[in-house]
């Protein structure tokens, strides 16, 4: 919005030209989202407390979590608000990639909101019925994936980028839709599963978004894309604005979500952020990179799959409790230790993922 306005005002004052610089807009996008989150935080927490929208804690969970019962949840609303406002202010409104991310972000946010609302009002830890949750997540993911396929069919936008290989970029064809679907839905659920401790999900999300900001900048720059042997995608540059908005909103939320948390993001935040990371990876053609950089989310999800599979097939559990962060809690690790160590691992994985762009 402000970019569009600046384009019309630059003929009156050349200083408005600064709004056309991607680096400037990336910085102010981060700061805008950060300040909105920090401003909304106390007001959102007070409002949620007044409405008695408190966290519902499972009775079979770690005993240390019982003290979290009643902590305000659905704080993801402030994250989504901060991201959306910042992106609308600082990104080019004509960029289709921006609208793809906002569609998934807001769509998954609405699904998460309904899920959270059922939990806090009905005091039901199950929330929205699983099949309906997956149905609506699938509708959004398939809709966006199909639209992207039609727009980018037989172009670099539908190729598969394989790490460590320069010239291995097979054209996916219709398999692009299937891959995009699994990445978007899978990442949404993976971040949702990770969001079980104070600050555990938001910081890896910030790290991955920051990593994708760098990738988006390189992908939208023809010289750097050619240098790194990745597809040049002319719309990708504006995803830098989206990624920095996620970073800013996430850091602002962490101010209130750090241990001991004053507010939880709820499904409205975790599903939306996961879906956003998924669609960003799809748009940048970096699904494999997401697996590396988002390794914490992958391991959390695999721990649940292995736990359920082992119990059904052998009648035995692999972990004391899944997702795996609860396993370490039950082993006696203090919650802050689990959180910070997972953060460290996440940061290392993002750096390793970025390094793979050069190792080809």
From Swiss-Prot:
UniProt KW keywords: Cell cycle, Cell division, Cell inner membrane, Cell membrane, Cell shape, Cell wall biogenesis/degradation, Magnesium, Membrane, Metal-binding, Peptidoglycan synthesis, Transferase, Transmembrane, Transmembrane helix
A molecular function (GO) term: UDP-N-acetylmuramoyl-L-alanyl-D-glutamyl-meso-2,6-diaminopimelyl-D-alanyl-D-alanine:undecaprenyl-phosphate transferase activity
Entry annotated with the keyword Lyase: no
EC number: 2.7.8.13
Membrane topology: Multi-pass membrane protein
UniProt subcellular location: Cell inner membrane
One GO cellular component term: plasma membrane
Function: Catalyzes the initial step of the lipid cycle reactions in the biosynthesis of the cell wall peptidoglycan: transfers peptidoglycan precursor phospho-MurNAc-pentapeptide from UDP-MurNAc-pentapeptide onto the lipid carrier undecaprenyl phosphate, yielding undecaprenyl-pyrophosphoryl-MurNAc-pentapeptide, known as lipid I.
HAMAP family with a match to the protein in the record: MraY
Protein name: Phospho-N-acetylmuramoyl-pentapeptide-transferase
């Amino acid at each position: 919005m402000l970019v569009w306005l600046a384009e019309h005002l630059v003929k009156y004052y050349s200083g408005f030209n600064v709004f056309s610089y991607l680096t400037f807009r990336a910085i102010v996008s981060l700061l805008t989202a950060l300040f909105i989150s920090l401003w909304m935080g106390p007001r959102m927490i007070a409002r949620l407390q007044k409405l008695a929208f408190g966290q519902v804690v499972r009775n079979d969970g770690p005993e240390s979590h019982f003290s979290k019962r009643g902590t305000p949840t659905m704080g993801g609303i402030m994250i989504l608000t901060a991201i959306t406002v910042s992106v609308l202010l600082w990104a080019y409104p004509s960029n289709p990639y921006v609208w793809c991310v906002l569609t998934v972000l807001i769509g998954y946010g609405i699904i998460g909101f309904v899920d959270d609302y059922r939990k806090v009002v009905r005091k039901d830890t199950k929330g929205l019925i699983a099949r309906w949750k997956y149905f609506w997540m699938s509708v959004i993911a398939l809709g966006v994936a199909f639209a992207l396929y039609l727009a980018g069919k037989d172009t670099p936008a539908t190729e598969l980028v394989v790490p460590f290989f320069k010239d291995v970029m097979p054209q996916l064809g219709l398999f692009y839709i299937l891959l995009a679907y699994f990445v978007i839905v899978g990442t949404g659920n993976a971040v949702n599963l990770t969001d079980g401790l104070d600050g555990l999900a938001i910081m890896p999300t910030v790290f991955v978004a920051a990593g994708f900001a760098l990738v988006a900048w390189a992908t939208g720059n023809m010289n750097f894309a050619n240098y790194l042997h990745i597809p040049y995608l002319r719309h990708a540059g504006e995803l830098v604005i989206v990624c920095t908005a996620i970073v800013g909103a996430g850091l602002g939320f962490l101010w209130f979500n750090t241990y001991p948390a004053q507010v939880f993001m709820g499904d409205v935040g975790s599903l939306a952020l996961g879906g956003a990371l998924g669609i960003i990876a799809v748009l940048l053609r970096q699904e494999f990179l997401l697996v590396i950089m988002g390794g914490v989310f992958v391991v959390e999800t695999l721990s649940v799959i292995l736990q359920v599979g082992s119990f059904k097939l052998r009648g035995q559990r692999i972990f004391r409790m899944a997702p795996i962060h609860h396993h370490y809690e039950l082993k006696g690790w203090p919650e802050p230790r689990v959180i910070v160590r997972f953060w460290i691992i996440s940061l290392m994985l993002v750096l390793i993922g970025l390094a793979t762009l050069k190792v080809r």
